């Protein structure tokens, strides 16, 4: 067993055969912790289980979790490519016990897998324990037979884990592999522990204590186990390598970049190939999990990683964009373990190509400035912070990219100066991730949830029902009662009201009770994802905790929401059929009056695309197939072809919605907890009313169904009828009538233009000649023409020159308050009088500037058409100067 894929499979099979639920990797965007930028450890998906907010049917689990560390306090980006073990993307192998087995079995599993299953030499392994954890110390002696000098007590926080200042915590035991005395370094806890001889390969966390404000306050009633082993590290050990980048997966990716660049991964180029291989993994997996490059939050970190890799591609001399051409090699290596890579491959390649083309322009300008700024700097010098900031602010060069670019030359960057320059601006591109967090009153919901548990939702089959009030929240605090006029959130033990989630708006309706109680529910929220909070105003009577009440949803509103929600599923399927499998949902709004659907696609949809998609959805609606619902495990549902939305929280049992038919398969199959129509015909009709961009690579469709669509059609039919009445024709003939009117208008415009030209000639040569005068021995013709198109001025001046024989002609055309002036000089006067001088004098009189042309023909204009006569006079005055 040598390949990384075999090691991953072996790990999961071992723990699966030992009673652990094999759990697929969660997405890189955490669904249960908005304070985290990315999933950065194997235990993140199980955080709520460890804290008691969730329970699992099987108390043991194992996974190979995708992780990214490139933002926040867990940021390995700067070191990637220059060390043997730093990565932005890695896989964390882990086994977990939720109140089941504890230290002895955890150590037994670890030792058995490493030495018996994988055959690692026992004399190459040693363990650390927290300095007061005598139990773990003795277990290592008993189970592994390790001598005491290879069980090292560590007193630092490295061997004690805590989930913040409050909550579960406990000691750790780390397993190290000794690469041999030919490599410098000492064992953990020694002065030389930072060397590379002894490498941590597995961390066992024993969650056994409860702490408050950083102080241990007692023992957990059900101690738990959380372990983590970096797949890349153990692959290096099992493949006989000391460097993670020498393992099979990285070798394949580096070989691909060597082939495409014709540059070997040696010497100064070694780090660049490693950076590209690592960053290819993180960027591709982030894109596959729905993160798109942007200038803030997760998207900004993704763009930083992309650009760092692309700069190293530039260092390798790549003449054309490189990153997108490496994606097939990554899919070949990891696509079997992570099918989402293959599904998203077109989107990954197109996004990488677009970003690299854009960044190559940025890079060219930035590198030029950087070279100029460092021309006089040598090893040990510092680049001024304001220069680094200019690179960032003007050329899009992140600070770490500048720092990385200067690393090889031994030039540092003045970070304090950079920060000072940054503070002077309100730029937020590099703002630290703060997460969305919970509302300010989130603690009250935690208190209620712990006391009463989750609200039971009955709304899939019912629109009314009775329930008991279990909590009331007013102004962010729990209250015992509420009176008429109060705004209050009502929590009951069971409800038919759908709480806003998954893009679907919450239900509205009424809550009634004894003694004339009436509450008008405006919407229903879903705090913590478990409670249903009915936001209501007490219209009459009073409500108190413990009351039995009746709940009635607004059925007409619910029906409209259901139609719109089912239509989004059909729309999603139609988009994928028409545009490709790269289309994934990026967001949605399902309201009573409309639906909005955001999806991944790089370009605007054509009119043909929109028409085809709309027609396909309506065909499914007319077929009126029954919508089927099945409850399944998430794994079975996905295996059966259901589309799961990454980032959505799915429980042990999910609802699988199947709609329509294509051949012998359902048209749409998705995991969804929302409310839907019983048959597709209930949607009525589907109409797309707009398609637009949301952000780079994300498009938005807004649409109407049912009554909303009917009203939309009626409004347009009324507009057509009114237009027909105005045009004195029938609705059927409006197009022909408008076409005829437009043709007639064009004809009249041509006739008008000819008439204006004729008028410009004074209605005949006699009138034009009457406008001629002698000015300082030069024949001068000056005319002001209302409504003349400026483009006709030259033709009129040519005619005037022919009439004059020898002389100067000036014409001012006035249109909508503005004026255009043009002047012409006959050839015999070209050396004496300049048309440019005449025009500039006239332009100044018209309140304008400039004017130009040739000595024999010039033109200009100004905003003050009322001064047209003054412009003629100013031009005439030039001849007397």
Curated annotation (Swiss-Prot):
<dbReference type="GO" id="GO:0005829">
    <property type="term" value="C:cytosol"/>
</dbReference>
<keyword id="KW-0547">Nucleotide-binding</keyword>
<keyword id="KW-0479">Metal-binding</keyword>
<feature type="binding site">
    <location>
        <position position="676"/>
    </location>
    <ligand>
        <name>Zn(2+)</name>
    </ligand>
</feature>
<dbReference type="GO" id="GO:0006419">
    <property type="term" value="P:alanyl-tRNA aminoacylation"/>
</dbReference>
<dbReference type="InterPro" id="IPR023033">
    <property type="entry name" value="Ala_tRNA_ligase_euk/bac"/>
</dbReference>
<dbReference type="InterPro" id="IPR018165">
    <property type="entry name" value="Ala-tRNA-synth_IIc_core"/>
</dbReference>
<dbReference type="GO" id="GO:0000049">
    <property type="term" value="F:tRNA binding"/>
</dbReference>
<feature type="binding site">
    <location>
        <position position="672"/>
    </location>
    <ligand>
        <name>Zn(2+)</name>
    </ligand>
</feature>
<dbReference type="GO" id="GO:0045892">
    <property type="term" value="P:negative regulation of DNA-templated transcription"/>
</dbReference>
<feature type="binding site">
    <location>
        <position position="569"/>
    </location>
    <ligand>
        <name>Zn(2+)</name>
    </ligand>
</feature>
<dbReference type="InterPro" id="IPR018162">
    <property type="entry name" value="Ala-tRNA-ligase_IIc_anticod-bd"/>
</dbReference>
<dbReference type="InterPro" id="IPR003156">
    <property type="entry name" value="DHHA1_dom"/>
</dbReference>
<dbReference type="GO" id="GO:0004813">
    <property type="term" value="F:alanine-tRNA ligase activity"/>
</dbReference>
<protein>
    <recommendedName>
        <fullName>Alanine--tRNA ligase</fullName>
        <ecNumber>6.1.1.7</ecNumber>
    </recommendedName>
</protein>
<dbReference type="Pfam" id="PF01411">
    <property type="entry name" value="tRNA-synt_2c"/>
</dbReference>
<dbReference type="InterPro" id="IPR018164">
    <property type="entry name" value="Ala-tRNA-synth_IIc_N"/>
</dbReference>
<dbReference type="InterPro" id="IPR002318">
    <property type="entry name" value="Ala-tRNA-lgiase_IIc"/>
</dbReference>
<keyword id="KW-0030">Aminoacyl-tRNA synthetase</keyword>
<keyword id="KW-0067">ATP-binding</keyword>
<comment type="function">
    <text>Catalyzes the attachment of alanine to tRNA(Ala) in a two-step reaction: alanine is first activated by ATP to form Ala-AMP and then transferred to the acceptor end of tRNA(Ala). Also edits incorrectly charged Ser-tRNA(Ala) and Gly-tRNA(Ala) via its editing domain.</text>
</comment>
<dbReference type="InterPro" id="IPR050058">
    <property type="entry name" value="Ala-tRNA_ligase"/>
</dbReference>
<dbReference type="GO" id="GO:0002161">
    <property type="term" value="F:aminoacyl-tRNA deacylase activity"/>
</dbReference>
<dbReference type="InterPro" id="IPR045864">
    <property type="entry name" value="aa-tRNA-synth_II/BPL/LPL"/>
</dbReference>
<feature type="binding site">
    <location>
        <position position="565"/>
    </location>
    <ligand>
        <name>Zn(2+)</name>
    </ligand>
</feature>
<keyword id="KW-0963">Cytoplasm</keyword>
<keyword id="KW-0820">tRNA-binding</keyword>
<dbReference type="GO" id="GO:0005524">
    <property type="term" value="F:ATP binding"/>
</dbReference>
<dbReference type="InterPro" id="IPR009000">
    <property type="entry name" value="Transl_B-barrel_sf"/>
</dbReference>
<dbReference type="InterPro" id="IPR012947">
    <property type="entry name" value="tRNA_SAD"/>
</dbReference>
<keyword id="KW-0694">RNA-binding</keyword>
<keyword id="KW-0862">Zinc</keyword>
<keyword id="KW-0648">Protein biosynthesis</keyword>
<keyword id="KW-0436">Ligase</keyword>
<dbReference type="Pfam" id="PF07973">
    <property type="entry name" value="tRNA_SAD"/>
</dbReference>
<dbReference type="InterPro" id="IPR018163">
    <property type="entry name" value="Thr/Ala-tRNA-synth_IIc_edit"/>
</dbReference>
<dbReference type="Pfam" id="PF02272">
    <property type="entry name" value="DHHA1"/>
</dbReference>
<comment type="similarity">
    <text>Belongs to the class-II aminoacyl-tRNA synthetase family.</text>
</comment>
<dbReference type="GO" id="GO:0008270">
    <property type="term" value="F:zinc ion binding"/>
</dbReference>
């Amino acid at each position: 067993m040598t390949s990384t894929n075999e090691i991953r499979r072996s790990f999961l099979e071992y723990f699966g055969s030992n009673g652990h639920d094999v759990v697929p990797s969660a997405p890189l965007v955490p669904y249960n912790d908005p304070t985290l930028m990315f999933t950065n450890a194997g235990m993140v998906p199980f955080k709520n289980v460890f804290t008691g907010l969730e329970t699992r049917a099987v108390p043991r689990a194992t996974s190979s979790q995708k992780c990214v560390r490139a933002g926040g306090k867990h940021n390995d980006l700067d070191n990637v490519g220059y060390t043997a073990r730093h990565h932005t993307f890695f896989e964390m192998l882990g086994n977990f016990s939720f109140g089941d087995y504890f230290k002895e079995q955890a150590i037994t599993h670890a030792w058995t897998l490493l030495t018996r299953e994988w055959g690692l030499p026992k004399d190459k392994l040693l363990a650390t324990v927290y300095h007061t954890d005598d139990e773990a110390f003795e277990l290592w002696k008993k189970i592994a037979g390790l001598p005491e000098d290879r069980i090292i007590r560590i007193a630092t926080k490295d061997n004690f884990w805590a989930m913040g200042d409050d909550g579960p915590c406990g000691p750790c035991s780390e397993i190290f592999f000794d690469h041999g005395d030919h490599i410098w370094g000492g064992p953990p806890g020694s002065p030389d522990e930072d060397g590379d001889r002894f490498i941590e390969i597995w961390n066992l966390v024993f969650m056994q204590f409860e702490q408050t404000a950083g102080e241990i306050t007692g023992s957990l009633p059900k101690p738990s186990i959380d372990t983590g082993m970096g797949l890349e590290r153990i692959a290096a050990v099992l493949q006989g390598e000391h460097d993670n980048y020498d393992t099979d997966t990285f070798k394949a990716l580096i070989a691909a970049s060597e082939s495409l660049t014709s540059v070997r991964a040696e010497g100064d180029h070694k780090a660049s190939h490693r950076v590209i291989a690592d960053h290819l993994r993180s960027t591709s997996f982030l894109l596959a999990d729905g993160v798109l490059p942007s200038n803030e939050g997760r998207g900004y970190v993704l763009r930083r990683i992309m650009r760092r890799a692309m700069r190293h591609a530039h260092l390798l001399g790549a003449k054309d964009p490189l990153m997108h051409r490496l994606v097939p090699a990554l899919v070949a290596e990891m696509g079997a373990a992570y099918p989402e890579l293959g599904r998203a491959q077109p989107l990954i390649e197109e996004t990488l190509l677009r970003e690299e083309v854009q960044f190559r322009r940025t890079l060219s300008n930035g590198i030029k400035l950087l070279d100029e700024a460092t021309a006089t700097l040598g090893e040990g010098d510092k680049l001024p912070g304001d220069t680094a900031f200019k690179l960032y602010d003007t050329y899009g060069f992140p600070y770490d990219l500048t720092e990385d670019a200067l690393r090889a030359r031994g030039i540092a960057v003045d970070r304090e100066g950079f920060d000072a320059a940054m503070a002077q601006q309100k730029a937020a591109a590099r703002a630290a991730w703060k997460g969305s967090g919970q509302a300010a009153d989130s603690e009250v919901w935690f208190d209620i949830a712990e006391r009463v548990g989750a609200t039971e939702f009955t709304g899939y089959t019912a629109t009314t029902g009775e329930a008991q009030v279990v909590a009331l929240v007013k102004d962010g605090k729990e209250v015992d009662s509420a009176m008429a006029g109060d705004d209050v959130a009502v929590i009951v033990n069971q409800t038919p009201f759908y709480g806003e989630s998954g893009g679907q708006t919450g239900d509205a309706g009424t809550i009634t009770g004894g003694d004339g109680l009436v509450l008008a529910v405006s919407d229903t929220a879903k705090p913590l994802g478990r409670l249903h909070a009915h936001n209501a105003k007490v219209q009459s009577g009073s409500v108190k905790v413990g009351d039995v009440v009746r709940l009635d949803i607004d059925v007409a509103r619910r029906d409209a929401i259901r139609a719109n929600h089912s239509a989004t599923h059909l729309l999603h399927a139609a988009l994928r059929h028409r545009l490709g499998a790269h289309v994934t949902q990026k967001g949605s709004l399902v309201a009573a009056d409309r639906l909005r659907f955001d999806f991944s696609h790089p370009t605007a949809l054509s009119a043909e695309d929109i028409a085809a998609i709309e027609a396909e959805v309506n065909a499914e609606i007319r077929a009126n197939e029954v919508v089927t619902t099945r409850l399944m495990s998430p794994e079975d549902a996905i295996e059966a072809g259901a589309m799961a939305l990454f980032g959505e929280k799915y429980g042990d049992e999910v609802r699988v919605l199947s709609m329509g038919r294509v051949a012998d398969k359902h048209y749409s199959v998705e995991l969804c907890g929302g409310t839907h129509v019983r048959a597709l015909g209930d949607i009525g009709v589907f109409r797309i009313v707009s398609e637009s961009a949301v952000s780079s690579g994300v498009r938005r469709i807004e649409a109407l169904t049912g009554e909303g669509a009917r009203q939309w059609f009626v409004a347009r039919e009324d507009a057509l009828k009114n237009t027909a009445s105005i045009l004195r024709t029938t609705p059927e003939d409006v197009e022909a009538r408008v076409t005829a009117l437009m043709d007639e208008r064009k004809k009249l415009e041509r006739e008008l233009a000819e008439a204006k030209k004729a008028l410009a000639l004074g209605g005949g040569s006699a009138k034009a000649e009457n406008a001629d005068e002698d000015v300082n021995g030069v024949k001068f013709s000056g005319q002001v023409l209302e409504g003349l198109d400026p483009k006709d001025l030259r033709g009129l001046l040519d005619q005037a020159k022919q009439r004059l024989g020898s002389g100067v002609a000036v014409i001012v055309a006035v249109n909508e308050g503005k004026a255009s002036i043009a002047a012409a000089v006959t050839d015999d006067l070209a050396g004496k009088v300049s048309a440019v001088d005449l025009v500039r004098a006239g332009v100044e009189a018209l309140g304008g500037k400039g004017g130009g042309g040739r000595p024999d023909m010039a033109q200009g204009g100004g905003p003050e058409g009322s001064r047209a006569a003054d412009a003629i006079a100013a031009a005439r005055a030039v001849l007397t100067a």
